[in-house]
């Protein structure tokens, strides 16, 4: 990593509680959390936004959210993000078939029409040489209302923030997803 984490005792007490919970849940503390937590106000904002986007009552299915986060992570070369989000995709879908086919989703029969338009939208937002068109937005509207499109756009934007942060700071994968 290009910036190292501080010793745990140097983080505020409430962040140490968060780290304790991560260690209990994942058997380790996530490196990006330790980096964001060097600036506690940023950590709090990022954690709140992530929790809002990944809530149970989201209009986006858990599998769809995972497909989006893995694809953005692939594009932005975030090895940590591909690791953790692929692990979540496996847990949510029960299979890594779509995860393994994600880089070539356009040529795969594994993805339904909704997933394909969402992945096209994801790429249009993430790649800097692409634009979201009115035609693409019209196809999205076949599957989502305005609030759903806003949530999807927010998720894509958040994952771009997260994956670019982790990629720039060279956060390594932590072994969450062991693909056979």
Regions found by a protein language model. Name each.
Residues 1-60:
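Mobile cap/lid helix-loop segments that border enzyme active or cofactor-binding sites
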Residues 41-44, 82-101:
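Iron-sulfur (Fe-S) cluster-binding segments and ferredoxin-like electron-carrier domains
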Residues 26, 57-74:
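Immediate flanking context of iron-sulfur cluster ligation sites
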Residues 102-113:
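Acidic/His metal-coordination segments adjacent to aromatic residues that form catalytic metal sites
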Residues 68, 72-86:
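Short, thiol/selenol-centered motifs that function as redox-active sites or metal-ligating centers
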Residues 36, 50, 67-72, 102, ...:
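Short alpha-helical scaffolding segments that buttress acidic/His motifs in well-ordered protein cores
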């Amino acid at each position: 990593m290009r910036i190292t984490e501080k010793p745990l005792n140097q983080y505020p007490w409430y962040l140490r509680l968060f780290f304790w919970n991560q260690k209990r849940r994942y058997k380790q503390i996530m490196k990006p959390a330790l980096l964001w937590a060097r600036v506690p106000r940023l950590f709090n904002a990022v954690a709140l936004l992530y929790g809002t986007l990944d809530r149970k009552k989201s209009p986006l299915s858990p599998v769809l959210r995972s497909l989006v986060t893995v694809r953005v992570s692939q594009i932005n070369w975030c090895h940590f993000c591909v690791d953790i989000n692929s692990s979540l995709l496996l847990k949510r879908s029960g299979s890594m078939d779509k995860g393994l086919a994600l880089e070539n989703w356009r040529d795969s029969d594994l993805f339904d029409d909704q997933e394909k338009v969402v992945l096209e939208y994801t790429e249009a937002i993430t790649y800097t040489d692409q634009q979201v068109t009115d035609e693409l937005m019209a196809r999205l509207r076949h599957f989502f209302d305005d609030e759903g499109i806003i949530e999807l756009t927010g998720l894509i934007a958040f994952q771009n923030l997260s994956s670019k942060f982790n990629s720039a700071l060279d956060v390594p994968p932590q072994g969450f997803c062991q693909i056979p």
